């Protein structure tokens, strides 16, 4: 139950990040993700209780967990084409991000989470030997599962996603549950966690293609999904999450962008007669405005503040 707790909440965090390049990371997307996980767990608890009475054996439980691990490992590989098609379809019918993200989470993570949800009542049924200590047994098992969920939440958000990305985060949680499940099955089922481990070593594919140009860099930062798109003329755009807005622009032959960033060069002169001695940029992004100021006003001291340090590195 500890391993399943880790994987369940870890998958929830990773699922929300999986939605970000397509539907953003708004409260609506998070609400849909949490709601789908809770519904899937509820159905899993109910179904797991029935399965526990019909098949009160460890191999049956481990087989279910192993199947859930396989489904979880497949999620990042089917998400890009599926979510891209879903986004195009929902844009065509003007349904919006709420229905789009809800459908995406339902289709991708509901089934593996439901199957993991069967573990709690099933494991309690196997662990319970006497009615006298049934309450203590159930309480201990749920406590173990909850501690695992806490660990999975923090591991996904603070460690795995920033360090290895969303795809390998799903694979890591799938590997954890597959290893635990394989211990209760015959030796040949060890091939499943071995296969998942092999996928972990495989190169990470493109998270989301662009119809404007070539994606030359992608990153899952602590705060968001970021990518750099290079247009046919060499201009580069920094896009975050769903990419509806351009957050920074780079042109190889000029610091001017032809966009809103150029306005910051002249705005100080509405109240000053000379270039400012010092400016502060809150939300520096990839440094578009700072680069322009350094070119046109080299004597101006620039303080660029960006909460997401990886954008500065980009």
Stretches with model-predicted labels:
Residues 249-264:
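Conserved SAM-binding loop and adjacent beta-strand
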Residues 1-219, 227-233, 242-246, 258, ...:
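Alpha-helical transmembrane segments of multi-pass membrane proteins
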